[in-house]
Amino acid sequence: MKTKLVNLALVWSVAFACSFASGFPQQPAQNQLPTGSLFSTEELAKGFGSHQFTPFGDPKFSLDILVPTGWESHLSDYDPGQLSHDTESPVPMIEFYPNGADDLGVNVQYMRVPGDKPVSAVVDMYAKSANGTIAARQQLDLPERKVEDFLMKTTDDSLGPVLNRVMAFRRGDIVFIATAWSVEEKYEQYKKIFATVLASFNPTGK
């Protein structure tokens, strides 16, 4: 993994990407799934760093994403058998979280999905497999991709109610699923950070 300081070009690209919500979402989505320029240029530069990852040691899966300053980040553990069965369930790629925290974090997964299956159907399946309830939903037009963006409520045996903001989009036969989650009582505090991080996710592999 390589880490570099966020530069002005990246700051502006993130702000630009966040501003492209398609249509006018209903008020609940606006409140719970914020988009747009949520931080100033100075706040972005101080509060986030651009990290580069190469999951599975495969350049085809290389990606860039903003990670909040001070958070721990690493490639996800996975079973090699998951890669050969990536049409059956999502495969973990990366994850990060505040130092020492176990009640919030961000992760990215991928799943190989036939081109004739819409991402919205993948989202529905993902929520069902997590025993989740979709509380708010919208579609975003971000540069080079259309994104299914939704807030899912789940229950963790140890943590209780959890809110998960999920953005999913397609690149070829790959659907990327980026999730930012927290215990319900912390979601309001972190929702702008989650929005900025998820919108910054950029697969760079070819």
Task: List each language-model region with its residue ranges.
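A short acidic-to-branched-hydrophobic micro-motif
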Residues: 90-121
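Surface-exposed flexible segments
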Residues: 109-111, 119-126, 191-199
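Residue-level recognition of well-ordered beta-strand positions that form the cores
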Residues: 109, 151-153, 179-181
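N-terminal targeting sequences that direct proteins away from the cytosol to non-cytosolic compartments
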Residues: 2-12, 16-102, 140, 158-160, ...
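Surface-exposed aromatic
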Residues: 105-107, 148, 176-177
